[in-house]
């Protein structure tokens, strides 16, 4: 027992894979904070910079007993673990000087402010790259740093639906599309930013210094959810898949069904899953028909 405990303790005390990497996070809500949390989870030293009003997630909740409190927001806590913090008003000369001092120290800056706002603060990549030539800047916005929508303010829902993903995944055929249930575009943008940002950090010696990693949350969703199904088909044949509703056509039966104590998600894709479902249903005779013996014929006859 003592040997096992010692081994676990030894693993816990080892530095993370990103130990020694210094990160400044200057973001709000989800995309930049979660991206920075991925760095901190792997051992990077992350300093979160908040404007005097604080991260908007502090006011978003959820809160214990539904009582709003700036220090008790669940959304803020989940995306900001393992970080140090400082308040800094970058709109003032003293605040900007402090922020620039942090940039000179850092390997990475992660931010999700509007491009025009960063330019107004003189903190856009063109303005700060000379401060620290090895600095990697990860800018995560709904629509990217360039293009027709780059100057537009937007939120997770705007980025998600602009990608076209909701035309396939949100709601049932013939009905109004639905909102997705979480900050999907922001989280996918954050993961994309962390992945390419870490590559940029470790590639600095190859490219001769730092660089800007420009992440569009809408494009991250389009690449993950829309690309394989729709972009190629539309480009080649003018065809795109419509909404299929809940479930997977190839995985029939795959859907949400009412049951005695609520609802159940059912997916019987593999042979073992199908046989288990048959058993739960009492092995009805119709389940022995040839058309139901593999997932392809089940899908064709669903």
Regions found by a protein language model. Give the residues of each.
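N-terminal helix-loop segment corresponding to the beta1-alpha1 unit
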Residues: 1-206
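Glycine-rich beta-alpha junction loops
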Residues: 53, 142-144, 217-222, 261-263, ...
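Short Pro/Gly-enriched beta-strand edge/turn motifs at strand-loop
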Residues: 58-63, 234-241
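Short Gly/Pro-enriched turn/cap motifs at secondary-structure boundaries
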Residues: 76, 241-249, 254-256
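Conserved Rossmann-fold dehydrogenase catalytic segment
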Residues: 174-183, 205-221, 243-249, 290-294
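Oxidoreductase and adenylate-handling cofactor-binding alpha/beta cores
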Residues: 163, 190-211, 223-236, 278-285, ...
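Aromatic-enriched alpha-helical interface/lid elements that frame and gate functional surfaces
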Residues: 252-302
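Residue-level marker for the onset of beta-strands and adjacent loop->beta junctions
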Residues: 12, 75, 211, 252-253
